[in-house]
Amino acid sequence: MSENSTPNNPVVPGAGADGPSLSDSASISGSDAVNLAAEQSKSTAHRNIPGLGDLPIPDDTANLREGPNLHDGLLALLPLVGVWRGEGQADTAEDGQYAFGQQITFAHDGENYLSFESRMWKLDEEGNPTGVDQRESGFWRINLKDEIEFVCTHAGGVVEIYYGQPLNERAWQLESASTMVTATGPSTLGPGKRLYGLLPTNELGWVDERLVGDALKPRMSAQLTRVIG
């Protein structure tokens, strides 16, 4: 396995000139955010991810209204819990530029971590799915100093450790401290940064930037709507 590290010059990425920027994630008032969330939850509050139901431990839940209570240590990550689905754009060394669909699941089981799963599929020029793209899974943790740890595994042969912090109540920035690529993994994947944030529409936006040469360049970004939770 090969390892890369990230330079210590953090960059706050945006979602692009054609859409809301993640730097706008704190621009909505608290009361407006609550009202918007209440309206949107009318179609998502009754849904949850499936569980086996016969385990001697709690099933994962992506709906804060169901299952075990969220651990007190995760309150700074609470807005992420749910299932999010939408579309994004990629510009990678492996596959060039393309559009993709994505579903992200943030779930918990009452313990002091969030589980994370991302599934992606490529889209053609008409927006039709053409096949499976990338998958990721991992865990988010945050300590009493609001320091976030994100362990992320990629199905394509990458394991990464990110550290970061909340930028505000609706945005979270992460920087890769270790990017390990297997012998069959993407040798061109450099270290990078990610920013996740709730837009004024309460959609979840995220941006992944990677080191190319001496500069960080956008690799992937997406705008996702809550479908569960």
Curated annotation (Swiss-Prot):
Residues 18-33 have a biased composition (Low complexity). A motif (GXWXGXG) lies at residues 82-88. Residues 1-54 are annotated as: Disordered. InterPro entries: Calycin, Nb(III)_bact/plant, Nitrobindin, THAP4-like_heme-bd. Coiled coil: none annotated. Belongs to the nitrobindin family. This is Ferric nitrobindin-like protein.
